[in-house]
Structures are given as structure tokens and as C-alpha cells.
Amino acid sequence: MKTLAYLLLAAVCFISASAAENEATFVILPDTQTYFEQCPEVFESQIDWIVKNHDSIDAVIQVGDLTQENYPAEWYLAHRMMVRIDSVGLPLSLNLGNHDIGSRPFKYSDTYNTDLANRYFPLSERSGKPYWGGNLHEGRIDAHYISVDAGGANWKIISLPFGPTDRELEWAGQIADSHPDSYIVLNTHAYLYCDSTLIDGKDYWKPTDYGYANDSLRGCPNNGDGIWEKFVSRHRNVIAVFCGHVLKSGVGTRVSKGVNGNMVYEMLANFQRGVEGSKMGGEGYLRIATFHFDTKELEVKTYSPWLKRYHASPAHNFIFKNVDFTNYTTHE
């Protein structure tokens, strides 16, 4: 009963407050793919809520699998909805998951082809945003980063596609190294498994199992363990990783120490059809991650604008305490 009262109070406080100077709040949109397949009105309720509460949000992070079948009609609808986030001036980090990649619709990462994603979310549109940081691949959004000022600090949110290559991880490292005064957040589709370990060669749904792993022009993809080893663990200013992709429980949480002593807060959240207990494509659940500088906490809540309630499971509502924000950057 106390938990329910807390969550109801948190909802009122979030909706009524504007983005505070001493905290940074990011909304994470987990895999949205089966909303387009079954019930786009549920996804629309998420966008409605984000737009309504945009003054309390510093950025929106969509973790990939925006579409289910990589079909033009899905991309058209996705763009029509997502530009509403643009319309209120909110920074948006997009990600390309395995369902957003392929030689044609209904092919899931059989080859590395993101033409449809780049047709409906063209670089010419995304790079015109004031928060745009840069991109790796000429004329494409596949690997990019955005720059967000929140909580009195600067954040670089780096988006790397499903199974990033060594080249993409090296580029991400260059972004982190060239911005030592910025907190780094990684947005990538496949990173954690549902047992809260890094996706590796033993797990289902690992990037190296997909056909595009044999695309010689693309290069070999990395699973979660490769992403950790080659990028996340090496840079002092990396503070968080958000991902989706994995089914079963669709949830995982891990805190890891990088080689420079910084703690990295890593979170998997997925509610799509196929996840245990999923209804209506995911019932509209999204994540709200708030970094509280004053109390040294990272607070995570999971809310459904469609159901108008918080998730009942403690696995989806929790607080990381004693976050040493001074241990990441040269920013004071």
C-alpha cells in the first residue's frame, strides 16, 4: 500500500514539475514495434504524454525496433508520431534495431540495409536540430550523438545501431574522449540479457546470429560483451547504457565498474509482444530515468500513459543510491 501511495505521489510530482536545475530526466521508449502491428493508439498515448509533459523532460531515448516489419507504412506512421516530439523542442535520440534493418520488409537484419529508416528520418532533418552533435556514416543517422544540457551539466547521448561494429565503437570512444566534461549515455538496441548479464555468444537473440553478421562491407557486429569491452568500460565519463531487444522477462539491470573506477548503470527494458505477460503490444510502458545531483541518486520509474499507472514490479521501479557524479567528468 505504501508503494502504491509513493508511486501516485511521484506521478503527481512529475506531471506538475518543470525540469529542475539539479536533475536530468530522460524518457526511454522501449521497443515500439508491435504497437504498429496491433495497436498504434497505445504508442500514440505515449507520445501524447511526452508532449504534455515536455517541460519536465530533458530528452527522449528510443532504443530501437521502432518498426516491426521495416515496412514503409510503419515508417510513415512512426515519423508522423515522432515529429510531435520535435514540435515541442525535445531532444530525441533514435536507434536502429534488428527489425529496422534488412534487405526489404519482413527480413530482419539479413543484410545491413537501413535505407528505409534514413528515408523517413533523413539526416537533413535530424541534423538541423539544435541538439544534434554529429554522425559517423556520411548522409546517414545510423550512428550519431546528440548534446543535451540538463541538471547544470552537459550530456552526450550516443546512439549505436544493433550490433555496432568495431569502427562504430571506436568512433563512440572518440566522442567520449573529446568531451571529457560531458556525461556519456549509450543508446543501443542489444546489450543486456534478461538475466542482467551482458549479451554474449551463449545467449539467444545475439547480433552475431543474424545474417548481416556475414556482410563483409559492414564488418562484424558486436554483442553486449564486445560493446562493454571495446567502448563502455574504457571511458571515465560513461554513466549509463539503455537497451531493449530481449524477450522472456524483458528486463535486466546491472551496475558495472569501468577501468577508470566509474560505475556504469545499465538497463534493459522491453514490453513488446513476446515478452512474458505482454498485452496490447506492451501496454504503453515507458521508462523515466532521473539523475538527482543533490541526493546522489538515479531514480528509475516505469509508467504507462495508456493505463495511467506505474508498473507494479519492483524490477521496474527502483533507485540507485550513492551515485558519485563527481567521478565521471571534469565538470564541477
Model regions and ranges:
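Extended active-site neighborhood of metal-dependent phosphoesterases/phosphodiesterases
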Residues: 72-170, 177-179, 251-269, 285-288, ...
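Active-site environment of divalent metal-dependent phosphoester hydrolases
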Residues: 35-37, 68-71, 96-105, 141-142, ...
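Active-site-proximal segments of metal-dependent phosphoesterases and phosphodiesterases across multiple
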Residues: 179-238
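Active-site neighborhood of phospho(di)ester-bond hydrolases with catalytic His/Asp-centered motifs
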Residues: 28-30, 58-65, 91-98, 160, ...
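N-terminal active-site segment of His-dependent metallophosphoesterases
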Residues: 17-74, 204-206
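Conserved beta-sheet core of the metallophosphoesterase superfamily
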Residues: 211, 217-293
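Loop/turn elements at helix/coil->beta-strand transitions in domains of secreted/extracellular proteins
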Residues: 21-25, 55-60, 86-93, 150-157, ...
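A short C-terminal boundary segment appended to hydrolase-like catalytic domains
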Residues: 279-332
